[in-house]
Each structure stands twice: as structure tokens, then as C-alpha cells.
């Protein structure tokens, strides 16, 4: 969430003063040109709106914002939601290519009370080509009851479910199979997903019991990407909870999900 006309040479010998002035004007012109190109480049980068309402965790929105800015597309990021100074509205969505509902919080009904008024507009925006990215808590909200109802199926609590290796809502590190490879990711009470038969879905990762953990689905002309785990978690998340990741702390999985969702 991520713009000189050549001079005709003088035939008389230039003085030191004219050389200095000319050099100063040229430098100023180049600086102005560079600043203009930087502004233009920033405007050309796609805009991502990241929800950062009061129910979210302190690090959730800033963490995914950093990953978005560092992505190959170099998203510009704007925070939206209560307390940010920018409301999530149809007009705000119209300026953006990607909307991110990060993780954090446990008050699903409380967050939904903030989001329900925009639900119809958000669904229409995705239907017409926008992209929704939901991470953990935001992945639950991509489902229904309550939620935006963007999935060809639904989200459910995977921790404690039959076949789950995580019995409760603890912070932990789990293995997933991501595009055929075993990878380890940060996990805290994220959802798994059910998928309707014949749905247009790309399952990027599954939990150890085969349940879809990360997927991207079509929704009209748009895309919906959801992750139960936190592929965007950086080293600080692990350190804070006394955890480590044997794979390291690369953002390659998060970038894979972003690229698949926001194409």
C-alpha cells in the first residue's frame, strides 16, 4: 500500500561565474527531474490498503506492510480502519488493487461490527477485479458467519480439530507442505479451509493432515488469497515467543502468496 531544454552555446568565453551558475542550474534541474521521476514512480506502484483497526495486534499490520513494500511490485501501503484516519469505503477501495485483512485479535464479532457496513462494497470490488488477502484472523473473515463470504467453501478453526497437531491456541511453529515442499511456518489458532467441489482454487499449502492451509481462489474477476498460518511473520515474532524456524526467516512464502493473490 506502495512524478531542460538544451541551451544554445554562447560563443564568448564563459567566465568562472557563469560556469558556477550554469552548473548550479544544471544540478538543480537534475535534482528536480529526479524528484519528479520518483513521485511519478511512486504513483505508478499499485496501492494496497491494510486494515489496522484497534482489534488487531500491534505488529500484524506493519509486518505485512513491510512485506508488501518489499515485494517485486513494490506496493504503496495505506492503513485503513478505525483509528487510522482513513475509513474503509468504496471510494478508498476504488483506488486500490489489493486489500489486506491481517491477523491479530480474537474478537471476531467486534471486528465484524466495524467491517459489516462495507461488506457489500468490498465483495463488489473483488467481483470487479480487486484482490483480497486474509491472514489468519483475516482468513476467517474471508469466510462466513461472520465474514465477507468470499470463499468457495469456508474457514474453520484447525487447532484442536480432528487430525490437527496443535491442540489449542498456543503460538507455535508447524510444518506445512507448500507447493510440494515441507516448510515451517508460524502458527497461532489459524483456520483451515473447506473447498466446494469444482471450485476454481489453487491450494498453495496444506497442513500435516492434508487440510488446505493456504489457498487462492477466483471470485468473479478478482482473487482471494487466504492463509491460516503466518508466512509473513519475521524473526521478531518467533523471538518474542521463544520460538525459532529451522528453515530461516525468508519472506519467500509470503511473497509467493502475495504474487498469486495480487496478480
Regions found by a protein language model. Name each.
Residues 1-14, 25-32:
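N-terminal secretory signal peptides
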Residues 75-91:
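A short, well-structured beta->alpha microelement
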Residues 14-20:
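N-terminal export leaders
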Residues 106-178:
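A glycine-rich, often tryptophan-bearing local segment used as a flexible ligand/cofactor-contacting loop or short
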Residues 33-45:
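C-terminal region of N-terminal signal peptides and the immediate post-cleavage residues
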Residues 168-233:
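Catalytic beta-strand/loop cores that center a nucleophilic Ser/Cys/Thr
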Residues 46, 123, 229-263:
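Extracellular ligand-binding/catalytic regions of CAZymes and related secreted enzymes
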Residues 49-73:
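Short, charged N-terminal beta->alpha structural module
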Amino acid at each position: 500500500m506502495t512524478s531542460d531544454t538544451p541551451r544554445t552555446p554562447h560563443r564568448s568565453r564563459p567566465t568562472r561565474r557563469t560556469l558556477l551558475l550554469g552548473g548550479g542550474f544544471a544540478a538543480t534541474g537534475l535534482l528536480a527531474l529526479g524528484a519528479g521521476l520518483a513521485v511519478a514512480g511512486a504513483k505508478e506502484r499499485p496501492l494496497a490498503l491494510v486494515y489496522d483497526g484497534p482489534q488487531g495486534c500491534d505488529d500484524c499490520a506493519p509486518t505485512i506492510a513491510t512485506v508488501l513494500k518489499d515485494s517485486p511490485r513494490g506496493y504503496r501501503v495505506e492503513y485503513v480502519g478505525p483509528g487510522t484516519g482513513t475509513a474503509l469505503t468504496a471510494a478508498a477501495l476504488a483506488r486500490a488493487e489489493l486489500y489486506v485483512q491481517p491477523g491479530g485479535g480474537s474478537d471476531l464479532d467486534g471486528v465484524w461490527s466495524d467491517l459489516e457496513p462495507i461488506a457489500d462494497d468490498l465483495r463488489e470490488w473483488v467481483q470487479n477485479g480487486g484482490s483480497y488477502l486474509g491472514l489468519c484472523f483475516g482468513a476467517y473473515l474471508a469466510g462466513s458467519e461472520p465474514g465477507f463470504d468470499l470463499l468457495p467453501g469456508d474457514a474453520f478453526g484447525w487447532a484442536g480439530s480432528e487430525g490437527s497437531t496443535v491442540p489449542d491456541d498456543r503460538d507455535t511453529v508447524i510444518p506445512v507442505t507448500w507447493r510440494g515442499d515441507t516448510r515451517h511456518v508460524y502458527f497461532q489458532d489459524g483456520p483451515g479451509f473447506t473447498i466446494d467441489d469444482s471450485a476454481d482454487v489453487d491450494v498453495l499449502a496444506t497442513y500435516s493432515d492434508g487440510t488446505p492451509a493456504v489457498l487462492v481462489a477466483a471470485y468473479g474477476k478478482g482473487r482471494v488469497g487466504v492463509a491460516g498460518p503466518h508466512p509473513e511473520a519475521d524473526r521478531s515474532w518467533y523471538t518474542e515467543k521463544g520460538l525459532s524456524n529451522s528453515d530461516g526467516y525468508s519472506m519467500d512464502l509470503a511473497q509467493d502468496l502475495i504474487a498469486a493473490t495480487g496478480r
